[in-house]
A protein has these predicted regions:
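N-terminal periplasmic/intermembrane-space "pro-region" immediately following the signal or transit peptide
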Residues: 2, 25-62, 69-71
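Surface-exposed beta-loop-beta
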Residues: 213-299
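Surface-exposed, low-hydrophobicity segments enriched in Gly/Pro/acidic/Ser residues
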Residues: 29-40, 44-47, 155, 176, ...
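Bacterial Sec-dependent N-terminal signal peptides
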Residues: 1-31
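A generic membrane alpha-helix/interface feature
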Residues: 9, 71, 78, 164, ...
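Outer membrane beta-barrel
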Residues: 46, 50-69, 77, 81-212, ...
């Protein structure tokens, strides 16, 4: 059987950043579950919105035109083409986000509430809905609970406003479809820049595992996801950063068949099936290991 890949030419027009109730100098949110740094720029907030300085409403849209080789071509991101169409205009993303920060007596917040929707011609879905609580004594710990991006890898958490391309890599889309999941996460990230470990961030969280593919968790198996990230170090005109990630989870077996890698009689690598009835209802392991590094040239 010969499989042919149908190529799709995508031409994103532009990304429009719509900012409301923001300071004159834009400090946007680079990572999906982080706090917007503009909350701390008190002296640049316009007096007319002084009353709402702890509230941010932001958004952006990414209109797109796509041309495929034939009608009804499958598309990995954005949905398949309709039966009688090989070209289309579409809204790849149209986001509106509301962030509210509960201030503390210090310059750092007590809590962050974040809510984001994606409203396109395909419907309206919730992308983020989480509460982040900060430890205010030493300002190094936080807890995040709700629907938010899973802390695995660099690209999964990187906002599309900062990526070089509109879409994440195919690997990220396959392993982490939708990027988000429901769970709880604990983070170590010193807020004070003078702290000796201010360049380190550690996340560890527990998640349902199915992401946005279902309305509820379909089994009792949860995903453990953790990530150690080294924030950028500057060397002249270069910034170097990196991290390591680990996911340990599983799926409940709906059948008695379990496939594992093995060896054939001639030494070839094959999948070997185990059809024992004891496999029914057990957990099939899902373990991911990741490492990433970023090098940025300032110019």
């Amino acid at each position: 059987m010969i499989c042919r890949k149908k190529q799709i030419i995508a031409a994103p027009f532009f990304a429009l950043l719509l900012l409301f109730l923001t300071p004159n100098k834009v400090h946007s949110q680079r990572y999906l579950a982080d706090i917007d740094s503009s909350f701390f720029i008190k002296d640049t907030v316009r007096p007319v919105i002084k009353r709402f300085e702890n509230l941010r409403i932001t958004g952006y849209i990414q209109p797109q035109f796509q041309k495929a080789q034939s009608d009804g071509s499958p598309s990995f991101s954005g949905g398949n083409f309709s039966q009688f169409s090989s070209s289309r205009f579409m809204l790849r993303r149209a986001r509106v986000k509301i962030d509210y920060v509960l201030p503390s007596k210090s310059r750092y917040p007590k809590a962050l509430f974040s809510f984001q929707i994606d409203a396109t011609e395909r419907g309206v879905i919730v992308r983020d809905m989480f509460l982040k609580l900060f430890e205010t004594k030493n300002n190094v710990l936080s807890m995040t609970a709700g629907l938010f991006a899973r802390p695995f890898g660099y690209e999964v958490n990187l906002s599309s406003a900062f990526r070089e391309t509109p879409e994440r890599g195919r690997m990220s889309q396959i392993l982490m479809p939708g990027e988000r999941d429901i769970g709880i996460m604990f983070s170590y990230e010193p807020q004070e820049k003078k702290h000796k470990l201010s360049h380190i961030k550690v996340d560890i969280g527990f998640f349902n595992g199915q992401g946005l593919s279902g309305t509820t968790d379909f089994d009792d198996h949860k995903d453990l996801i953790t990530r150690l990230f080294i924030k950028p170090y500057s060397f002249n005109k270069l910034d170097l950063s990196g991290g390591v990630s680990y996911l340990r989870g599983g799926w409940k077996n709906g059948t008695k068949y379990v496939y594992e890698s093995g060896k054939a009689s001639n030494g070839d690598n094959i999948f070997v099936v185990d059809s024992s009835m004891a496999n029914l209802g057990k957990s099939s392991p899902r373990h991911y290991y990741g490492a990433d590094a970023q090098l940025k040239l300032k110019h």
